[in-house]
Amino acid sequence: MISSCSDNVEGVNGSNENQTGSTEYTASVGFDWATSRNVSVSVSSPKTTVVSIYSDKDCSEATLLVGDLLVSSTTTFLELNIPIHCETLYLKYNSVSGKKTMPIALNTNTRNEVVAAIVPEDCVQPTSEEDAGFRFYHNTGVAMFEDTWPNESGNDNDMNDVVFEYDLKVTECQKEDLLPAQGYKEGLLMTLDVRAKGGRYPTKLGVVLGGLDKKYIKETTVRIVLKGGQGTEQELATGTDMAEVREVNGQVQYCKVTIDTKGDSPIVILDGLSDLGDNTNFFQVTPGYVEEGRPMLRAEIKLTGVNRSDAGVTKAESDAQLAAYRELITDTKKQNFFIVTHDNKEIHMKGYKPTYSYTNYDTDSKGLMMDNVPYCNKNGFVWGIKVPVGIAHASEKVLFSTAYPKFKEWVESDGAKNKDWYLHCLLYTSPSPRD
């Protein structure tokens, strides 16, 4: 289904007849493609209370940055990663008259800044110790890839050869006295939802969780589910470090999810993209062949940290583990998303190294990439991008810069202009619903 989210649809018909084979855009060597930025927030309160901070005034689950944060008159300092267009954060707290929201203004011209927030006087204390026991950090977004690396995609640069939604939640104990009995709750919960596949070649998608040493992982759990709307799901398979399914509701559908801890950082891989759609209309990208509301194939990964109160765990080790998990959210550069094609090529985003198992990068790249900048050619062209909001993906054969008309100027201005380009779509395929 073709949808418009702009009043101006003149000349947009889903074809590229007027396009040439020339480079769609030219990016500078130093452009980092960042769609998010870091802010430091200090939070204090006249009395002990629990708050949550969001990146949008609707305070939806998708815009949650940190939840159930216990604050008091002693200032709590946070490092948060927010969408780059964000001008205001929103602090939600409980008051005597119910839930309230307080805006926190930001400086949009600064990548790294410090802002202070003081919870209003009408806040109330948490109702139980359990309510104040754990905080969690949250990060979500959409990853989109082209499968033509090391060649540019030309007139087919629609960034929809693989599209998946990602969601990461890190839980940590914020009351030391709860750690001995409740420390097993600390860790990472991550979901990867396969939204669309518009390419013939992709077979797998994955992510390297950079900086998370395997010594900080005590237990792993894998689930494969079908994720519907309003929180509905159908469990298909479970396991510890691997889960596999070969049939879904009577239809052939191979899917295997693994957690690989053989390298320096854990690697999560979902294999099974080959069974999605066909080689004519593909999967959820071609107008007229998009099934609205179709449940998405989901990989759910849970990594449980070592209980930091266990005997033999030093304070330095405890702090290092806490930082390693938290930084998966607050330093999103540690999220190394990628896809794998039928000939075993790995395609990552700009600047990210391939995994330890892909040893043919130098040969396969054919000398077309920038020196010392993996997966970025000498025109600045890239094959993957992630956006920290739930944007739609482009329809098949619609140039990404046509679907998102502010995108090209954002790239060619080194990110100085149109920071909110991903909020302004012209032609796209509607995404499946998510919570």
Each language-model region and where it sits:
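Short helix/strand-capping turn motifs
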Residues: 101, 115-137, 141-151, 197-254, ...
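Short, well-ordered beta-strand segments enriched in hydrophobic/aromatic residues
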Residues: 166, 186-196
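Short, ordered, surface-exposed loop/turn motifs in non-cytosolic proteins
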Residues: 37, 45-64, 159, 204
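Short Pro-Gly-centered beta-turn/loop motif in secreted/extracellular proteins
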Residues: 72-90
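Short, acidic Ser/Thr/Gly-rich low-complexity loop/linker segments typical of extracellular
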Residues: 60-76
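Conserved small/polar residues in nucleotide/adenosyl-binding loops
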Residues: 428-435
